[in-house]
């Protein structure tokens, strides 16, 4: 569960992260691959390998990160539902889906 999010910082299970993060179920890791607000398929390898029902992409506090259409299409062809939201909303959606018992993963951008 994501305890909180504010610009530049996540708190997950009581631990602070001042970087982008990936989440798979209740596991969290720093994600340092995202460069210049651009996503690539490589950013999603570990998430796809976990075989989630849903992947949430947190696009930053102001929604600056824009996932390319090709990435969304690739994920959907894998049978994965994709939700793209500003990071604050994406955190709430992640927690809600996790509470519902969904197999969910996420990539969350921590700043703009």
Where are these regions (language model features)?
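C-terminal structural segments of small proteins and small subunits
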Residues: 81-109
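Flexible, charged surface loops at secondary-structure boundaries
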Residues: 48-51, 99
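A short acidic, glycine/proline-enriched capping/turn motif at secondary-structure boundaries
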Residues: 61-63, 89-91, 112
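Mid-chain, well-packed structural core segment of small domains
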Residues: 53-85
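Non-catalytic interface/targeting segments
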Residues: 1-41, 98-112
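A short, acidic, amphipathic alpha-helical segment used as a generic capping/interface helix at domain edges
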Residues: 39-49
